[in-house]
Amino acid sequence: MRVSTKTMSVVALAAISILAVDQAIAVPPPTARVGEPAPQFNAQDITGKTIRLGDYAGKTIVLEWTNDGCPFVGKHYDSGNMQALQQKYTAAGVVWLTLASSAPGEQGYVTPAEAKADLAHWRATPTDFLLDPNGIVGRLYDARATPNMVVIDRTGRVAYMGAIDDTPSTRLADVKTAHNYVTAALDALAAGQPVAVTSTRAYGCSIKYSDE
């Protein structure tokens, strides 16, 4: 059977259209970019309540990815550094959201009960602790290691993303001499000044996503 050129063109166009749709579906969600609006998300906290980023519109927000078995995270909690930051800045009106994005069965995953126990053990006081076992929020913000930090300004734009400081070690003593990027960003925003360092590479333990 002869197939006309017109018929072949229609088939080709249909194939291209299907391919385009498949590719569009396969494209991952956009990740956060410094200076651009922070990607919106919702996640359940450790009480089962759904928390939306938009709930905190107009406020400065810190996103802190954590892992209770990571020595790099342990450095900042065992030294009391992370708790001190949480207390200082939440008292000043900053919203501090701690997140766990490792998949079930992977190192770093926590149940609500385990997350509550971690907060009690560390005497941590974030605004909330969000659970992200499917990794949706972590991928949106390209979180790859713990601790991974993001600062969002009052206009809803990403002001800083990356490491907590400039000293990638597990030594508690290094906290005192390290330059803390999160502190610098928050203080600059509070003073109405531009953030000097807006992006760094996070160091620490890798976040174990479900398909990686």
Task: Enumerate the language-model features and the residues they cover.
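Structural microenvironment flanking redox-active thiols in thiol-disulfide oxidoreductases
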Residues: 74-122, 132-140
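N-proximal helix/coil linker or "cap" segments that precede and/or mark the start of modular domains
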Residues: 20-40
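Bacterial N-terminal signal peptides
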Residues: 10-20
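Short active-site neighborhood of thiol/selenol oxidoreductases, capturing the structured segment around
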Residues: 55-74, 186
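Bacterial N-terminal signal peptides that target proteins for export
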Residues: 2-11
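Thiol-/selenol-based redox modules, centered on thioredoxin-like
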Residues: 151-212
